Amino acid sequence: VIEGISCLDYLVMYTKFKIFNKPEDNKLDTVGEHEIGINKVDYDGTLWDLSVKDWETYVDYNLRDVELLVLLDEKLQYINLIRFLSHAGLCGLSQAIDTVPVINGAVAIKARQHNKYISTFFRPARIGKNPGGAVQDPKVGHVRNVVSFDANSLYPSIMISLNISPETKLGKVERNGDDVNIQHVSGRTFTLTKEAFVKYMKEEKASLSKSGHLFTQKEKGLMPEFLDNLYTKRKDMKNLGKEKEAFLNQNKSILSQEEIKKLEVDIQKCDTFQNAYKICLNSMYGYMGNLYAPLGDDDIAASITLTGQAINGKNRDLFVEYMQNTYGISDQEAEACCIGADTDSGYFSLYILEEKHGLNLLEDGMVSDRFYEECDKISEYINTHISEWVIKNFRSLDSRIVYKRESVCDAGIFLVKKQYVLHVLDDEGLKVKKFKYKGVAVVTGKMPKVVKPYIKTVIECLILEKDRDKCNGYFNDAYEKFKELPHHNICHISGMNNFEEYSKKCDGLKMANKMPVALKAAYRHNYMIRELKLDGKYPKFKTGDKVRYVNLKTPNRYGLETIAFHDKYPKEFEEIFQVDYEKQFDKIVFASVKSFYNAVNWTLRKPNENVRIELEDFLS
């Protein structure tokens, strides 16, 4: 340890702050290519061998690693972000990566401004888990004319609206026949008549969360004040970034390359810092449920999530109410418009308005003014009535719950909870034409990067054209290209935990009971490295490594079904084990595309199978 020197792991920072558009894994080579288009020096062996055999390349290898980190931070600004969080939370640079130290320090500053002091005592562990956010099962299938309405920072807004803070908590309410029991924070229990309870609520200016907890609103709490300040700063930073992005888009043709680069860096900086504010805002709920947070409180955590569930459910109800009141549609038609909901948002289809009322989404290839106007009317209706509802139901004196139009999409497909693909034409007011992938296999780190474009081509054709013959053509083309790819481009990718624990229970090539597939493949790799006396040539797997593994053709000399490797498939394995490309294609490409075909009731056949023509295909 060198006093005054902080050690920051850029991998940890990248994992923490990279929220959207993530690469398939967090290796420096992958991240460098993904973010700045530069790779590490290509070398497959151990660094020790490289240093002995080729010192000059060894030096270049290390210099390139340093260069990559410098260029990455020039773009991402994560070190500045850590410095900002460190100052905001009165903690060391290495501590600023964690939520608890930053919020402790930031709230302590806010408390001191009011001549208050925060607790430093740890609370007892809660039995069981706090309730989480509710996610609605979506209407599975192809959808058109979709608009999403998203709550502005729902959980922080709930804390501000109900003045939720440790020092404002009064107790918990429980019904007792016609009376009301209050379990007060002092430890005492009071029983009040309904009339006395109403009087008590008025005197305390108390809000009532969905979990039944009371919070006084006589004075603004530390947490709501802290969140209010963060929310304002994030909004300002986000608006600044949008202004710079709009200016760049409008003037790109007349700006110099130097000016464009500076604007792009400024836009990235704005995005990084608004995301930092967002992380702090959204971390407050997690902080409240954290056993090691001095100000943590499970009653507050439950109050936030259960109130959030109720509010997002009301958002859906108000949309249905608006559609029925304005257009006189039936309950069944209104229900069909409600596509799905995440924790803080709802997805609705307005296609029925195009069918029955001539409200077209598109006009000259762009979202029509009439469609925007209708979205604004829906948003206004939801916000007016949800504010009234929050004030009435939760006794809020300062409702901050606001739903805004997030995305306008002409088409998309929903599979299951939190898994969908949408073709977005408007993203928070910015006119775009892009696909938004959420939760599906093709955007996870478990799928090889080279394979993803083949699958996306099929999915995007299905969404925009819904042409089965064309989609099948793309799928068959993907199969032909897949067969020509090297092994490292068609492998499964997985993380690995508890590897040593499972490995100890293995006996030769007899695997431990319930050992995960990726761990089996990694164990077999290590076994074969020893068996073939390749210890100095290829590193062995250990817990925490990213595992690439493939299915093998059977039978083979060792009877193995799968085997793992690091970056490149060892040539020594080639002589013993043949990779089963058919099975790899089935598990990676076929399985992914099949889920989308199933969603629209299409049948997907494997390209290598000779199957009879089904009646539905003959008649279609």
Predicted regions mapped to residue ranges:
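Common nucleic-acid-contacting/processivity interface regions adjacent to the catalytic cores
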Residues: 46-173, 256-318, 340, 349-351, ...
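Catalytic nucleotidyl-transfer cores of nucleotide-processing enzymes
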Residues: 1-5, 123-294, 403, 414-445
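C-terminal, non-catalytic extensions of nucleic-acid polymerases
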Residues: 375-620
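A glycine-rich phosphate-binding loop feature that marks nucleotide/adenosyl-phosphate handling sites
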Residues: 84-96, 128, 174-179, 250-254, ...
